[in-house]
A protein has these predicted regions:
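Glycine/aspartate-rich loop-and-adjacent alpha/beta segment that forms the canonical ThDP
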Residues: 211-278
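N-terminal hydrophobic or amphipathic helices/low-complexity stretches enriched
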Residues: 1-13
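Thiamine diphosphate
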Residues: 108, 112-115, 120-223
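Cofactor-binding active-site loop characterized by glycine-rich and histidine/acidic residues
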Residues: 17-20, 32-162
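Short acidic, glycine/serine/threonine-rich loops at helix termini
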Residues: 74-75, 103, 152-154, 180-184, ...
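Structured core elements
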Residues: 63, 169, 205, 230-232
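Short, glycine-/Ser/Thr-/acidic-enriched flexible segments
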Residues: 69, 80, 175, 210-211, ...
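N-terminal capping segment at the start of a domain
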Residues: 10-26, 173-175
Length: 278
């Protein structure tokens, strides 16, 4: 898929995210919009996983540790054909499997997540299993920067480096905001890249909302033999909509009818700009 095709996907994915959150009257808007470009590139360019290969023991694995941004994951899985997109209309309804965090009841989801700080530990176990079983699959996991205050993330990091898990790719959605404010105000994380390097990762940084930059970075994995890979993806919370970008309140805010209409108009303009550049 070309860069422009991926850019088109991101616009459509953002529309879907906003529609399902608006319809459900619940969801995590800001974090889903910040990470959707990452998921787009993973599922449409990087990973060997599809509805046809999901039972294949050699498939790549994806674990969304920042489970609260599940709307982004649901959007991509529906587009890939794991389930009909119409199923998303049931999100957050009584009896629906489409809840506010990922569960294995949904086709295409590898692991239940939601309690922050656990996804990396699970991913390390999967990557170690691949090494022990001599299987070629890779394990990708997406963490929010806010969950890095969980000690389990650093325990898992030490383990990943100890076992030289160069088949593990950790992506940090570094949007610099969490539910109560800026990460550097809540619990300062910087110098984050240096910390991960000290824990034994091969670290690379990129613009996590730039499709071309993401493609280039993922294409270089593994970065260094014998080291787990870490991509520090610098993103914007609420990316793609002028009035949601870098606004703490949009962590869990649901768009009103008027806000949804305005957002759709902005995304239509973004789509038109892509066509002009084609």
């Amino acid at each position: 898929m070309s860069i422009q095709d991926l850019q088109r996907k991101s616009v459509e994915y953002r529309k879907t995210i906003l529609k399902i959150i608006h319809h459900a009257h619940a969801g995590h808007t800001g974090g889903s919009l910040s990470c959707i470009d990452i998921l787009n590139v993973l599922y449409n360019h990087v990973m060997n996983v599809s509805p046809d290969t999901f039972d294949d023991p050699t498939r790549d694995r994806y674990v969304q540790s920042k489970g609260h941004s599940v709307e982004a994951l649901y959007t991509v899985l529906a587009d890939k054909g794991f389930f009909p997109v119409e199923d998303l209309d049931t999100m957050e309804q009584y009896g629906s499997h489409f809840t506010g965090h990922p569960t294995r009841d949904i086709p295409g989801i590898e692991q239940n997540t939601g309690a922050l700080g656990h996804g990396l530990s699970v991913s390390v176990g999967m990557a170690l299993a691949a090494k022990l079983d001599k299987r070629p699959y890779r394990v990708f996991t997406l963490l929010g920067d806010g969950e890095l205050t969980e000690g389990s993330s650093w325990e898992a990091s030490m383990t990943a480096a100890h076992y030289k898990l160069d088949n593990l790719v950790v992506i940090i959605d570094r949007n610099k905001l969490q539910i109560t404010g800026p990460t550097e105000t809540v619990v300062a994380l910087e110098p984050l890249a240096d910390k991960f390097a000290a824990f034994g990762y091969a670290v690379r940084q990129c613009d996590g909302n730039d499709i071309a930059a993401l493609v280039e970075t993922f294409d270089r994995v593994p970065f260094e033999p014998g080291k787990p890979n870490l991509i520090l993806a610098n993103t914007v919370k609420g990316k793609g909509i002028s009035f949601t970008e870098n606004v703490v309140a949009w962590h869990h805010k649901v768009p009103t009818d008027d806000e949804l209409s305005r957002a759709m108009a902005e995304l239509d303009r973004a789509a038109a700009e892509i066509e002009v550049m084609a």
